Structures are given as C-alpha cells and as structure tokens.
Amino acid sequence: MASKPAAGKSRGEKRKRVVLTLKEKIDICTRLEKGESRKALMQEYNVGMSTLYDIRAHKAQLLRFFASSDSNKALEQRRTLHTPKLEHLDRVLYEWFLGKRSEGVPVSGPMLIEKAKDFYEQMQLTEPCVFSGGWLWRFKARHGIKKLDASSEKQSADHQAAEQFCAFFRSLAAEHGLSAEQVYNADETGLFWRCLPNPTPEGGAVPGPKQGKDRLTVLMCANATGSHRLKPLAIGKCSGPRAFKGIQHLPVAYKAQGNAWVDKEIFSDWFHHIFVPSVREHFRTIGLPEDSKAVLLLDSSRAHPQEAELVSSNVFTIFLPASVASLVQPMEQGIRRDFMRNFINPPVPLQGPHARYNMNDAIFSVACAWNAVPSHVFRRAWRKLWPSVAFAEGSSSEEELEAECFPVKPHNKSFAHILELVKEGSSCPGQLRQRQAASWGVAGREAEGGRPPAATSPAEVVWSSEKTPKADQDGRGDPGEGEEVAWEQAAVAFDAVLRFAERQPCFSAQEVGQLRALRAVFRSQQQETVGLEDVVVTSPEELAIPKCCLEASTET
C-alpha cells in the first residue's frame, strides 16, 4: 500500500526524498515509544508513514550502533547502517584499533591504513580496495570514531546519551515483555588479594622479601532482582594452583589467563557454558518456560566478543555505550561497592608460621562477599536504567532485607541456633596482631553503619569452659575427657578437619563453606579469650563476627 503524503503537501505534489540522520531516527523511535502522534512526526521530519515503520523496524540495529559509537557526532553525520564490502576486514581492523586505544597507544591515520593493508594481505583477499583518505574517513564515520589520538579508552560521561539509552532499554524490555527476572548485568573487577599492608615494626620497614600482590579478575553476574546470582568466575594466572590440589568443590568457576584478565575466548566460553545453562535452570526453578527470553547487559570492552557471537536461542546481549556505562550500569550503582566492602582481604606476611592464606582462601572470600550483597542493593542498582524494577518492592520487604543483612544475634541459644549463626562466619585466615586488628575492626564497624560488636558472643555458648560437660559421678569419664586442649592445638585440629573435608567428595560445597565459617568463629573467640598480641585472627571483621558468609559455595 502506498504511503500517504506527508501533512502539508497536496496530493498532486511529489514529496522530496528525505534521508534522516541516525540521530533523527533514534529521536523518532524515542518519541514513538512515548506515544507521540505519527502524523505530527511525519509533518516535522517530512517523511511518509512507511518511513516511520521502517525506522521502527530497525530500532535494534540503531541501538547496537549507538552502543558502540565513540560519540554522538557519528549519529549526527551518518545516515545509513550499510555494511562495508570487506566486512570481515573492517571488523578485525576495528578490534585492533580498540585494543591499541585501550593500551593508550596513539594510532594515526597512516598507521591505520598500513594496518588495513597488512590485514588485507594476511587474509589473502582478492576483492579490490583502495585504502585512501576517503576510505579512512568512511571507516571513522562507520564506527563513530571521533579522534584517533586514543589517549584513553575511558570516555567522559554523556548524560544526554544516557537518557537516550535508558529510553531505548525500557522500550526494548516492553517490546519483548521482559521481567526483572530475565534481565542480567555482568561486569569484571580486579582484586589484589595479597595487597593489604602488613604489620610493621614501629619506625622500620618490613624485613624480608617484598610482599606479593597476586591478582584475580572476578566476573560477577546477576539479574535485576538479585534472586539469581551466578557463581563468580575467577581468572588467575596459574592454570593449576597448588592450593586447589585435591579440592573437590570450588565456590567459583576458575579459569587461567597469562595476565589474569578476561579475554574474548574466556568470556565466550563463560557465556555459552555457564551463563546460558544457569539462566535456563533458573527459569525452570521459578516456573518460566525454558525458551523465555533473557538479556545480558554489558559494557563496551575489548574483552567482550561481538554481539552476534553472544547469542544462544532466546538469550542475547546488549552493549552499553562507553560514555554511558559509568552513569547507568547497574554493577557501578552500588553492587561492586558492596562486594568490595564485603570482600575480606587480610594481610599475609611472607615469613612466619601462619603464612597460609592462599588462592583457595581468596576464592572462598570472593564467594562470601558476593553472596553477602543484599537483594535490595541489586534492585536499587537498576533505579536509573529501569526505575520500575527498583521501586517494585514495598517498604516492608526492604525492612526484611535489612534485617537479613544485619541480624540481631541472641546471647543464649541452643546449639542448633548456633549452627545457623556459624553460617555467617568468615573464611579468610591471615595473621594480624591485636593492636592492628582492633584499629582495623573499628574501621570495619564504621563501614557497616557503626554497629559495635556485642559484649558477649553467641559462640561462647559452644566454647566457654564453664559450659563444658562434667565427668560422671563415679569419676569415670570418656577416654581423654579430663585432658585440656590448648587453643593452639584446637586451631591445628580445625585446619586439619577443613583440609580433609575439602578433599573428600562426600562433603558438599555448602558443608565445606560451613566448616570454614565455623573455623572463623572459633578464631574470633580465641582472640577474645587469649588476648595475646600474636594470636592469629582471620580478619578485622571477625572481631565483630561478620554479617555474612551464608552458603558461600552455592548460587542463591
């Protein structure tokens, strides 16, 4: 059917062909989603009805280009989304350019042309192509490259672009009927898990070799409600850490990479073999059809493959523009901060008998910190991008969540209740003298809202000598019942039991995590009872018994 003539034109007058810029097309999509009149838009932009329908049909492609563009200037200049003839060469060259820019290496126009010629020869292409100044201009316009100086990959925040992207995202969610259970965000963060300062002699430096700064990259992913948190992916430098030898269950997925960074191969493997199966399993659990749609929101990073490679049936990805990610990406709106606050990273000196904090302890700490982030933090993190999700829950549920985060610990409970408390213990052994631990513990309590530790720990019910069962009236007790066990002996026994459980398949990952939590509570009680400066404590947070470590080895 022929489109109606634009408003203001007579039937006999032929309308002049108008080719809108990509920015104008995006504005039209946004205004259509807001419910503005089609006739008013036809008159304003001097286009026909068929043009409006065509623009709306290509909304997804417009969104992808908007997400990958370097600046709004590309949207104002470019009018079509036509792909180049040598599409594979164009994609490889653009990825090379992004890599150099992220490294801070300046890339000039002649350098880009020479690299394009090199790729052309390496790919053994036969289709003629002239790598001229015009070709360079079209390449920059095609990818929205504003400058080639590439001083940094980090882009300044663009509030106008953020508003446009938010409008697109909400319309996309409405178009596909997506709920908060079906929308995910993933992001990476680096952890130097041996990097905290070490207790030093007053007025002097630490003797011995320099303290190591072992690095982990952690990939975290969760949906908008926080009800589905995937097991974190930890990337280290070593393919087979000695600390993992014989371990039956790990609370995280682990991959090795030379620089402990996420690369495209690792991310693609995570997407197809961990993310997609986990999402479908979650859908089965909550009663959604397995073929329900799911969206993964990512920032623009050279470690992430192209969108076309991150698709599996009804599971697809959307990239945030570089100038928008810092403003609206959910992981940057409180989730990462809460995770880092929960992460326990004690100082571990390279000398002394207690230098046992290893990779295994670090990844258990990662799992504890990740599972400790309250659900309401996830919902609130989407308030800028998707306000309807952030305020979907009532105030009563928020109060319940606060109660879950900061439980009030009773002083006199049965052993069954104590075991429930034990799940909240920490799992990061280290060495810290009492003075440093006390000062660090004050800072930790201030970070948690100024909640001081209780005067009496519930763990005293278990370990207090006053509660120890007495021998029978006839003086005959069980074998070994009259022998006192020193704190140091008990600590060694705890370590031995934990090492044994970690290497036995009959113990589940959750049970191993609970043993670690129990050991943490024991060491906290040891610190309070013995009161010696050289007593080993697991972390400053344990002076107040950490609020979380519940099911560190399972997905919530």
Curated annotation (Swiss-Prot):
MF terms (GO), sorted A to Z: DNA binding; mRNA binding
Domain HTH psq-type, chain residue ranges per copy: 11-62
Main location as per UniProt: nucleus
DDE-1 domain segment(s): 213-382
Residue ranges: DNA binding: 38-58, 110-142
GO BP terms in the entry: positive regulation of canonical Wnt signaling pathway
Localisation per UniProt entry: Nucleus
Chain residue ranges for the region called Disordered: 439-482
Organism domain of life: Eukaryota
Reported tissue expression: Expressed ubiquitously.
InterPro entries, A to Z: CenT-Element_Derived, DDE_SF_endonuclease_dom, Homeodomain-like_sf, HTH_CenpB_DNA-bd_dom, HTH_Psq
Similarity comment: family membership: Belongs to the tigger transposable element derived protein family.
Protein name per its UniProtKB record: Jerky protein homolog
Organism: Homo sapiens (Human)
Name of encoding gene: JRK
